[in-house]
Amino acid sequence: MSSWSFIFSVVVSAQGLVMNGYLVGLLVVAAVVALFLMYVIGLYNNLVALKNRFQNAFSQIDVQLKRRYDLIPNLVETAKGYMSHEKETLEAVIQARNTAMAAGQRAASNPGDPSAISNLSTAEVALAGSLNRFIGLAEAYPDLKANQNMLALQEELSSTENKIAFARQAFNDAVMHYNTACETFPGNLVAGFGNFQKGALWELNDTAQREPVQVKF
């Protein structure tokens, strides 16, 4: 073999090694990028799942709230025949119920909206106050207390109040889990890029808000 042939073969071999190294480098970079994208997609999908979870948790609250909103007119209608002198109180209960129901509908359409959840909380406090005043007055009417329909409604309302409390706690837990994922690294980067907004807790800020409706005649 001539010296020129040898040099040519060395050059070709070197070029082959360089090309192979370049391809290997490209493959490594492509693999790293693919893994990174898969990781980001996983974080994004996790945020979507957590958001869906807390929205579904609110739907459970909504079911129980609607059940209570349906019960209240029946309670008032049953009491009318016995509490004819308490018209103002009965009307206040219905008005508070209607206000809370409207606030509940707005919150159900967007459970992550802080103002909607805050308005619902305020309306529910007012409704609880009206119901407690109504129930307190009803205790002065023995015939009403003994009414079988009223007793059945009382039992159903009490059960519903308990379910609302449990559903609210489950909702708040789901929101906190979602918010933590949105606020901690690296989820906060994906949350910002994907425009994930923090969820709003249904907070009970004072003693009055924490007092459940006392359904007892």
Where are these regions (language model features)?
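A helix-centric hydrophobic-segment signal that preferentially recognizes long
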Residues: W4-F217
